[in-house]
């Protein structure tokens, strides 16, 4: 059969793109599965589970999700769509031991804890996956969720705070998290030994360096809550500039001088790197424990697909397709498209260089 001829995988970009034109959706999927099963053993194997639902849609969000969904859509996704897609890739699940699983979206914790557990139980050898990650929002994460994640030994819980300014939350259609709510959440997660991250977004107000003073107060307050780490993003819809990035780097260096139990694990915070950080829209991770921890999007220049990682991405639909990759083959499920990947070595090499300089070794 044409698609089982593995010489196809050695073709050029042009030939692979030609294949996309005449292969059936079934053949494209089969080609991707064969590539995944026969890819480099050195590549980490990642399972990504997408959640297409949110409690409400933030105005700046570019992720594939919606807030106005019906109960029937919700039930169909968890009772039919996900189980079917997991079964559809049973050949991979039966032959591959995944290194990481990442639940993203959308908001995975919009599903009740028992619904999430039913998904965990559908995934073969789920408990054997060493690195388990999940995204959450503070208003959907429950005690039942936290207990479930502890039960299944999740490595990393990322919680989207984004801003502690009520006016900013209103402006961008986000639910506000009060200081008391944040304190209660942090205390519970710490007391239960759950490794958790808080996300914050810079430049949400005026979109320039005038925002830095108030943003520094937010970071200091969040760090006082003692999360395992926090991730700093710039507002993606604003104009990235060297001036703003240098200002943010200076701010973070100042913050770390007062919170010496934290280090920036994925950046040297060197102003001379600002131009490159603007180009690749850098994220900065301030970490207080388990400095060697990382997952497939941990790089300062986060990108998907990621060189060195084969990613099987489920939870897709025609409305919200997801991207899977194996070595240099990219497969967009939901759209049934194949393409050739060209990785930017600057992203991967910069990440390794930073970790080596900081003495943070990767395996």
Where are the predicted features?
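Canonical Radical SAM [4Fe-4S] cluster-binding loop centered on the CxxxCxxC motif
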Residues: 41-78, 170
């Amino acid at each position: 059969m044409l698609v089982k001829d593995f010489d196809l995988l050695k073709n050029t970009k042009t030939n692979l793109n030609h294949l996309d034109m005449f292969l059936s959706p079934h053949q494209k999927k089969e080609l991707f599965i064969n590539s995944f099963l026969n890819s480099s053993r050195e590549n980490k194997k990642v399972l990504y589970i997408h959640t297409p639902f949110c409690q409400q849609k933030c105005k700046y969000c570019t992720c594939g999700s919606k807030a106005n969904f019906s109960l029937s859509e919700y039930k169909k996704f968890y009772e039919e769509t996900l189980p079917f897609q997991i079964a559809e890739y049973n050949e991979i699940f039966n032959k591959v031991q995944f290194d990481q699983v990442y639940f993203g979206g959308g908001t995975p914790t919009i599903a009740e804890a028992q619904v999430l557990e039913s998904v965990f139980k559908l995934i073969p050898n789920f408990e054997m996956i060493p690195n388990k990650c999940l995204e959450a929002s503070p208003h959907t994460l429950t005690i039942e969720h936290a207990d479930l994640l502890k039960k299944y030994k999740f490595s990393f819980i990322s919680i989207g705070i984004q801003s502690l300014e009520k006016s900013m939350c209103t402006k961008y259609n986000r639910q506000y998290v009060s200081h008391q709510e944040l304190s209660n959440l942090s205390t519970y997660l710490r007391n239960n030994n759950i490794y958790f991250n808080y996300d914050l977004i810079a430049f949400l107000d005026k979109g320039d360096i005038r925002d830095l003073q108030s943003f520094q107060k937010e970071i200091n307050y969040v760090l006082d809550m003692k999360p395992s780490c926090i991730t700093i993003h710039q507002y993606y819809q604003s104009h990235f500039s060297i001036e703003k990035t240098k200002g943010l780097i200076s701010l973070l260096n100042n913050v770390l001088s007062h919170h010496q139990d934290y280090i920036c694990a994925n950046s040297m915070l060197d102003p001379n790197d600002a131009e490159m950080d603007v180009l690749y829209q850098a994220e900065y991770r301030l970490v207080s424990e388990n400095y060697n921890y990382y997952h497939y999007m941990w790089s300062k220049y986060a990108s998907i697909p990621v060189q060195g990682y084969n990613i099987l991405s489920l939870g897709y639909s025609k409305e919200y397709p997801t991207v899977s990759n194996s070595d240099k083959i990219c497969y967009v499920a939901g759209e049934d498209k194949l393409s050739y990947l060209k990785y930017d070595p600057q992203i991967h090499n910069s990440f390794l260089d930073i970790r080596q300089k900081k003495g943070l070794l990767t395996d």
